[in-house]
Amino acid sequence: MDRVQYEPTPMKSVSMRANNTRREFFSKSKGGPMVWRNLFFPTEILNALGVKMLTLETYAALFARNYKRTKKALDIAAYKGFAGETCSFLRVLEGTELPQPAFGVSTSQPCQQGERIFQDLARQYNFTDRFYSLHTPINADDPYSVDQIAEGLQEAVYLMEKALGMKMDPARLAEACELSNQAAELSKRCNELRWTSPPLIRGAEGVYSAVLFSQLWGRQELIDIQKQFHDELCRKKEWAEKHYRIEDTHRLLWLHLPPFYDTKVLDYIETVCNAPIVFEEVNFVDWDRLDPADPYRSLARKLLTVGYLDPKLRVHYILETAKKAQLNGCILYNHGFGRCSLSDSCFAKHLREELDNVGLPLLTLDGDCMDPTTDPCSTLTKISSFTESLNAKKFGNMFGRIKGA
C-alpha cells in the first residue's frame, strides 16, 4: 500500500496554539503575579484569579529542541547532585533559571518525585511559605476524595488571596468553569471525529497539542482554538473518506508523552512503517461537566477523573478508546526507562494484561522525553518488528497491504 496521505491544507489551529504558547510562557508583559503550577493543578482557578501562571513541566519541554540549552541545564542539575534517576524534566528545571514566582501550587499525585523537586525549587527561590501542595487521592471511587480535594482547592485559593493581596471573584470562577465546559465539549467532538474516521492528521502533529495539559482551560482562547481545530477536522474527514476506509490502515494509540527533542520516532512509525497514530492519550477529554454553582467540587471530580491519577481508571479509558476508535495497536512511551510513575513497570503490566484480554497488542518503547543521549539504539528495530506483526495480522504478510488487494 502507498504511504497514507492527509488533506494538505496547513492547520490554522496549530499556529494559534503556538502563538498562545509564546504569549503564555515568553511574553514580557507583566500581567498578574506569577504563580508556578504543575500539570494537574486546575487552571480554571488560576485563570479566574487573574494570575500569570507557569506550568513547570511544560516550560521545561519547550526547551527540548535546543540541545545546547538542555544539556547545559542537565549538567548544572548534575553538579547540584541530581543524577539520571531523577526525571529529566525535573533536572532541566533544577538547571534552568526560572522566572521568580509569587506563589506555587502543585498536586501530590501522580508524580511524587516532581512534588519533591518543586518543594526543593521553592526553597531555592525562597518562597516555601507561599507554596501549596494539594493532597490528591488516586481513587476516584472513594466517596471522601471529592470533598478532600475540594477543601484543598479552597485552602489553596485562600492562601493565594492572602499572599498575593487578591480576591477570588465567584462570578469569574463560575465563568471559567463554563468556558472550560465549552472547550471540553469541542474537544470531545474533535476526538469523536478522529475516532470514527480514517486518519485525519498525523499523530506527530496531534501529540504536541496535548490539550489535556493546556494552561488555557477556563479561557476563551481554548474555545477558539478547539473550534478552529474542529472545523479543520471536518474538512479533513471529507477528504480522507474519499481516499480511505477506516479498515484500510493501521490505527494506533500513542500513550503518555512523546520525545520532545525531535519527531524521529513518530516519523518512523507513521512515514516509514506506514502505521498511522490516529489518537494520543494527552488529548483525551471525558470528565463530567463542571457545575459553575459548585466549582470546587466540580474541579475536584475533574482532577480525579482526568485519567492520570487512578491507574485503573486510566486503563479503562484506554480500553474504551480502543473500542470506539477501532484501534489495532497501542504504543506506550516509557519516559525515564520505568522511573516515571505514568509509564512504569506496574502500569505497563496492568495495561498489557487488560489489552491481552481484548487481543490488542502493546509496544513499550523505552526512552527519555528530554534527553536524546539516552535513546536506545534498538528503538527503530522494535518499531519495525511491531508493525511487521501488525501487518501480518491485518494484511496477511509482513509488508502491509498489497496494491490491488
Give the residues covered by each predicted segment:
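Redox- and metal-dependent alpha/beta enzyme cores, enriched for Fe-S-associated oxidoreductases
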Residues: 40, 45-70, 253-319, 323
